[in-house]
Structures are given as C-alpha cells and as structure tokens.
Amino acid sequence: MLSLIAILCACTGPTETNTGTSSETAGSATGTETATEAVTGTETGSAAADTDTQTETETKPTVSEDVIGIANVANAGYAMAGSCRNTDGYSNLHANDNDLSTPFSSQDFSAAESDVYLFVDLTRAYTVRSVVLLPAAGEAELFPVDFDLQVSDDGQAWTTVQSRTDVSGVGEAGVTVDMGGVEASFVRLLVHRMAEDKGKYRFALGEMQVLADVRRTDNLVLRQNDIWLYTDTSATLTAAYRRIANVTEEAPLRFFTDDPAVAEIDCNTGSITPRGFGDTLVYAYDGENLTACHVRVLDDTQTAFRISTFYHSNFGYPDVIPACLDYMKEAGIGFLEETRTYDAAGNQVCDYMMYLCAKRDIFYSVSDPLHDLALSKASQSRIIELVQKYENRAGFGGIYLVDEPHEESNDYARVARIIHDYNHHITPHLNLLPIGGFPSWDEYVSEYCAITGGTHRMEYLSYDNYCFMADGGFNWGVYNSLNKIRQYGLKYNASTGYYMQCMEIRGAYRISSDEELLFNASMGLAYGMKNFKWFVYLTPIGGGGEPFTTGVIGPDFKPSVMYEGVKAANARIAEWGKVLGKSDAVEVYHSDAVSGNEVVPEDFVIRQTSDNAAIYALYQSLEGDGRQYVVVVNRDFGKGRDKEFTFAVTEGLPSLELYDGGAWTSLDIGSGSFSLFIAAGDSAILRLPEGYDFRRPAAKPSDNLALGRAAFVSSSQYTFWTESDKASYRLTDGETASGGWLAGNRDTNPIVLIDLGEVRQISRVELFVFVTMEKRFPGSATIEVSADGVTWTQVFSSQITAGADGSASCGFDKADARYVRITAGGVRCALGEIGIYAQ
C-alpha cells in the first residue's frame, strides 16, 4: 500500500520532454467496457488549469484506501500460456487486451484430455472477486469444457478455487466464476478437457478478465509504472485509463515526486528529469486517484565489465522461466541477450521477459517481432519507433539485431548506428562470425566497425570462437581471434565482447571444468574484453541441428554441472571490472609463440624468471592521466595446476601493487624481483606507478596524419565470399595504387570520417582516385573538422577534379582537428586513399 502521509515534493516548471516514451506497455487497455475512459494526462494538466502550479514545492495529497468498486485488473498484467497459437491472428497478448476481436487459442492437441494452462500475472496482489471467461468471436464452440481456476502469490504454487465440468453452449456473456475474494497475484485457468476442431483439440478465448477490488491508489492506470532512466535521458509520466470512472474525463492530472534529488517531475506535464542516481516514486493525481510509478536513475559512470548470456526463449516455458532468471541473478549475470520473440509454448515474450528481468535488476535485450520482418532493411524512422516502443521501460537494455550475419552485415551495421545515434545507452545486440570459412574476414569486421562507429565509443564489437574441444583438445586459433578483435577495437574505438564456452555439443565441444570456465574469463580479461558473455544459458535441445546436451541451465531447467563454475568466474569478472572496466589492453603477449600473438619482449616491464605458460597484457586507463596496469594469466587451466610465478622487474621501477581481495597491496620489489601465486586458469592484476608509460615506442610518425587511422563511412560495399579490394580501411593504408572504398548503391553524398586519434593541426586533405573506378570519383567535396566530435567547422567546400597523379588537393587555413569529416558530392562515390597533412 502507498503511504498516506503527506510529504513535500519538488515541483518544477515546464521542461523539454522526451516524446519517445509515449508508447503503451503490455496489457494497456484499448478502450472497451472495462477500461472506462482514456486519460489525456499531460494535456489536461496545463498551467492554465491552475495558476498556482509553479511553486517550488507542493504537498502530495493523501487518498483513502477504501475500496471504490470492482473492475477488471487483468489487462494491466501479462498473459502467458502453456500452449499458444501465434499465427492467424492469435496471440497470448490477446487473452487480456480488452478486445474481443483479437482471440487467444491454444495449439492443437491430439487428445481432448490434455492439461493446458493460461495464466495472468497481475504484477501485484489483489482481492479477486470473480473471473470472467469470454468466448472467442466465432469460436464459442471451442470454449474450455473442463477447467480449474487457480490462484498463486508467486506463480509457482497454485491453489484451486473453483472447477467447472461439461461446460457447453456458452453465449456472448461467457462464464463468470465466483472467486470469493481470494488474495492473488496470479490467476490461472487450467483446462483439463478441450473441444474438437477439425479432428484435433484446442481451446480458444476472446478474453480472460479478473475482477478485483479497486482502490484510489490503483484505479488510475499508468502507461508505465516502472521507469529506468540515465542522467542524460528523460521521460513523461502519462496515464492510460481509469478502471472506474470516479472523476470526469477532463479532470486534470497533477504530478509529484518523493525524492527530487533523484528525479524531479513537472507538476503539470509529468515530465521527469533525473537529478541523481538512485530510486524514487513519482505520482499522478487526478483529484481522486493517486497512482505511483517507480523511477530508477541508473549510474553509468561506474567502472565495470558487463556480464551477459546468450538466451533462446524458444527453449523455455512460462512456468519455469522465473526460476531460471533467479538462477541468472544468483550467478551474477546482469544482461540477458534475447534472440527469440516467442517461447517454446508459442507465447510472444518481449514484454513479459523484460518485466521479469527488471524485477531481478537484469537488463534485457529484446527480440521484437520487427526482427522477423527484415529489420536490416527497415527505415531510420521505423528503427527509432522500435526503440521508442521500449524506451525508458524498466529492464530495457538493448535490441537484438542478428546472430552471425553474412553479406548483410553492413545493413545491420547501419541499424546499429541509428540506434546508437538515437540513444547511446541502448545496446544493438549483434554477434559477428569468427575467423575462418570466408576470405574477407578483415573487410567483414572493418566495414561493420566503419559503419557502426564514429566519434563515439562503440558498444559492443562482439564475436564467438570456442576452444574446449570434445576430443579433449584445445583450439589454439582462439588466441588469434581474440587478438584480432582486440586490435580492431583499439583502432575503431570499440568496447569488445566475446562468447565464453558453457555448453556441450556432442562431437564438437566438451563440458567445461571450473578451471576452464575461469580461464575463458581470464582470456577475455587478457585481451581487453568489456562484455563477458556466456554461451549458452538455456539448453537448446534440438536447436539448429546441433546436438546440445547442456548449457548454464540444463535441459531439466535446473543449474547444470557448470553453474557453480560460471558463478565463481562471474565473481572474478566483477572484481576485475572495478579496476579495468574503463581501460584498454593496449599490448598483449604470450610466454611463448602461439597463434597470431607475439612473445613477451625482453624489455617488458616485468620478466618471468620461472617457466610457466602465461599471457601478459598491458592495460591503459581511458581516463585521467592514463594509468597503466599489467595482467598476468596462468595459461595452464588443468585441474590442480596452480602455479607460483617469479618475476624480475624493469630497472628503476619504484613500486608495484597487486589487486587482491578488492584492495591494492604493495609488493616488495626492493630486490628487483617478486613472486605471485596464480591459480589454474586465473589471473593477477598489477598496478604501475602513476606517470609511468611502458608502451612500446610508436613507429616514426608519417607526414600523412591519416595513415593507419580509422576511417568511418556512411555506407560501404565489399565482396563477402571472395577476397575484396573494396573496404574503408584501404582509405588509410598508404596504398594509392590499389584498392579503396565504394559507397553504397543509394548513398547520395556519402560521408567519410577520419579519426586522427588526437587533436592535430591540419591544412590540407588529399583525395585519391580508386584506380579501377575512376568514374566514381566525387565531383565535389565538403570538409569539416572537429576537436571533440560535437562542434564542427567547415574548412573547405568546392568542386574537385583529380589531376594527372590521380588526386585532388583540398587546401584550407590551418585548423585544429581530431576528426575530419569529408562529404563526397555524388552517388555511390569511390575513393582510393585519403591523406591529411599539416602543411
């Protein structure tokens, strides 16, 4: 119950609102008989309605907790079924949407006596008076024949309240079942016998209504009652309808907040402005009814790694998923990467899964139905509408794009960029292919980065490649893949992530031991990963033709033999993230030569004097003065292979600290050496003194400031299945006579952005012809520069023509720039090279 004590709440004047929060959440009313009226909310609460609205503080009103009537509360909850048709206009979402024209149906069964459930999660406890089951339009003969009505406070343990048998001849009014005022958070229809339909058996409903006591504190139904924000985002609190019409439709809404230090709310418009991290309640009041909404302002300034898991809802059922999510929370997994729209029973799960995840403080990457309707080809406005559909909802963390795209990867890169540009807190969830199988992998990755990235930090550049083989062997190529992704992340300013093996596929990959699970995480640490992702959570039994036997959660929906190892590894990842979450692995070495990696140099800051297989990483902070750290990984992950490492330190190193147990401990290096005990597959983090830089000296700088730098483009074309001479990275590879970049087919006036890495003074840009595509050379060029990626200054705009040497020189007054943005005049333009010079 809401507190009835009046409190003083901050009330601010009109502020700019975020119109992207207006879409309805799951279960919103559609305006039929039980949703008594639509509420315009912010429009009715205007300053003209009350000249006293701009006061600095206002008192939140108190309202009576007396019951004011009985109304349907199911439509503000979530309906899920043990069997659900999701074709031909049927959906679980229709079971409680207050619209008799949209039906629910179970799938077909071969026997009439098949227990099938349909439940409504009311999201809180109500005193339930009755349940009304309304027949599906045109399918009254498919009304349940024998059934129980049950209640639960947790969705797990059910109590039967009423039963009906031999039900037939149901009219439009349906069947009303007295529930006797039972307290319930869940109401379930358990059907024991179904009617025949074309030789099969199923049941169908038009609506399942739950009539319960309504009070002034739950009569006014909000479009969102749980909102997550960041300090640079906003939302607007709006109301959907009143369950009981106890005030006029024109009644103005007023808004209040419990804690203005966390979130202020405009008294008239309901516009919520974050002010600090934390949780608070905000309220909407219409003169009679007072409804609360939880608001959380998330702290994205913390230094941390993300711990995620790859998730297939199509291998789970509604009655077991809450427990599986509890296991996820307990294991320390904070981000669920959904890849399916429907569960194994046929339910559309987007809204309910997000709700369940939010209750457990887990972020959810949604697989919206639009994903099945060519998301890669969707317009920019349609993609933004998709983000707005879920924006600011509790639990919303990302949008699933695709797993392992092939030649369509550039199309998905465009989608990822649109999502980031609209709201950089939302993660476009996409996983790239591992190395191998096609010759254009470098072009494949670089073009994804070039289209997705820009002046911002990209999150996340992600891929998979597994190493613990079914025959007991180890895939040594994983080190090359990790290093390649690390290098692309550094070049294109991308946080990286990778999938860690936690499954068994017969004949391919083995069940990982605790030490192997930890080593999987330690490898990610060594190579600078920021997103540690477990593959796979639910066991994909029969999925995709691969013979999976288990995942983090076994086929019985209980923790598998690997669960405790995953949990322990996650605890280590969380500790590492507190130190290195905002640092990059700028150099990585091995104690010996392995695939695609260098041997640790003799002049590295520490030199091992023992003889243990190890990985070394030099980290540099992205903040402040760039403090440096060293990570050492025990590469021996066999059971019981804990090792003592001894090291000599570089001459003149004044101090060295070890991160242990959440604190820094000074090591005794007075003798020029020290030792560490590192468990099998585990790692150690060392902190170097402030002001010390132990990176290898950079190569002699070129006069061409663009050489080797990241080139970001508005579009790109390359050949996926064969070696390609077309790629954006060729714009800065120093080769003017071969290869280059080709814009997309419909890209008018395409853009290239060069990141110089730091602010430099420049006065000339050279544009070179793509030697096999001279006719695609742009007819004009506009050049803009920026020091911060926010404020831009145009320094050149003119028609251009390539000279005899195949280049056009664009000169201008000296300007300070980190970013150089070139707009090429024309359609499907091509360039062979770009040079940027100080003189």
Residue spans of the language-model regions?
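C-terminal motif of bacterial Sec signal peptides marking the signal peptidase cleavage site
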Residues: L8-A10
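Ser/Thr-rich, Pro/Gly/Ala-heavy low-complexity intrinsically disordered linkers and tails
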Residues: T12-S64, V282
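Low-complexity, Pro/Thr/Ser/Gly/Ala-rich linker/spacer regions in secreted
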Residues: T55-N75, L211-R223, W228, H294-A304, ...
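Extracytoplasmic soluble-region selector
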Residues: P61, E65, R215-T301, A699
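Predominantly extracellular/luminal regions of secreted and cell-surface proteins
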Residues: S64-N98, A699-D733
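Aromatic, loop-rich ligand-recognition surfaces of beta-strand-rich domains
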Residues: D99-T160, G171-R216, D733-Q794, A804-Q839
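Exposed beta-strand face motif in extracellular beta-rich ectodomains
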Residues: S185-V187, A235, G278-V282, A684, ...
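Glycan-processing catalytic domains of CAZymes
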Residues: D299-P654, D660-G691
